[in-house]
Curated annotation (Swiss-Prot):
Pfam families: RNase_PH. It comes from Schizosaccharomyces pombe (strain 972 / ATCC 24843) (Fission yeast). It comes from the Eukaryota. PANTHER family: EXOSOME COMPLEX COMPONENT (PTHR11953), EXOSOME COMPLEX COMPONENT MTR3 (PTHR11953:SF2). The keyword rRNA-binding does not apply. CDD domains: RNase_PH_MTR3. This is Exosome complex component mtr3. InterPro entries: ExoRNase_PH_dom1, ExoRNase_PH_dom2_sf, PNPase/RNase_PH_dom_sf, Ribosomal_Su5_D2-typ_SF, RNase_PH.
């Protein structure tokens, strides 16, 4: 007697034939020094202390801030504890993400925390914790997404009226160690298709002129690293202008009767 619930395959079958994947087509129309246009919206989450929405072409990131609030631990701290959580939506990349936080997401959380913590006056909030939640709705390149997450998180902290000495903006560059080629604000196609194995991601405070964090990958001479750093700083300054405009716009809305 056959099992009616079991689905049997055909008695005669052939293995499937898989076509060779096509080579990625370069879609970048920007100059190597030009970053993507940015849209920034503050205060979109009414139940959060501070929030920001960052959009740069395909990159879409939402960030909320909770706190400062009393720490859940009983240990005394003379300054606030900053907690950052970076998460990718299941549909944010070409490969579907799981609901459990991956090692890469935890690493990005630590990198964002290290980039924005120098700008926050944590000593003014003892025995407290500040929680920053970063949700990537759509990603377009790991480097540019990380840099955008830094800018989005810092602008959300400013929207929460947390005392800071400056705002941190992120910037990224992709470069070829064997040639003089480089690409500011690289997208997914740039990272995948170009023969480039070097990258620089930076957190920068434009008003003070201080670099909070730099992550460099690949072989690079000191002179070229200095050149790429200057390119990242220029890009970070341009991003800062967008954040300043969004903060002024949100401030004017709150003052209107």
């Amino acid at each position: 007697m056959s099992d009616r619930k079991r689905v049997y395959g055909p008695s005669v079958s052939v293995p499937p034939y898989f076509e060779e994947p096509e080579q990625p087509v370069f879609t970048r129309t920007r100059d190597v020094d030009r970053c993507r246009k940015i849209y920034l919206k503050l205060g979109w989450a009414t139940k959060a202390v501070g929030s920001s929405y960052f959009e740069s072409e395909k990159i879409k990131i939402a960030c909320t801030v909770s706190g400062p609030r009393p720490s859940k631990t009983f240990a005394f701290r003379s300054s606030a504890k900053l907690n950052c959580e970076f998460r990718l939506s299941p549909f944010s990349t070409s490969v579907r993400q799981g609901h459990v936080q991956t090692v890469e997401e935890k690493s990005y959380s630590q990198m964002i925390e290290a980039a924005i913590s120098p700008s926050i006056l944590l000593h003014l909030y003892p025995k407290s914790s500040i929680d920053v939640y970063i949700q990537v709705i759509e990603s377009d390149g790991a480097l540019a997404t990380l840099a955008a997450a830094i800018s989005c998180a810092s602008s959300a902290i400013a929207d929460a009226n947390i005392d800071c000495i400056d705002l941190v903006t992120g910037s990224s560059v992709l470069f070829n160690p064997n040639t003089d080629e480089y690409w500011i604000d690289p997208d997914y196609v740039d990272e995948r298709a170009r023969a480039a194995k070097g990258s620089v991601v930076m957190g920068y405070m434009a008003s003070l002129g201080h670099v909070t964090q730099v992550w460099e990958r690949g072989t690079c001479s000191p002179s070229r690293l200095s050149f790429l750093t200057e390119k990242c700083i220029k890009n970070a300054k341009d991003t800062r202008l967008v954040i300043n405009h969004a903060l002024l716009l949100e401030k004017s809305k709150s003052e209107d009767p």
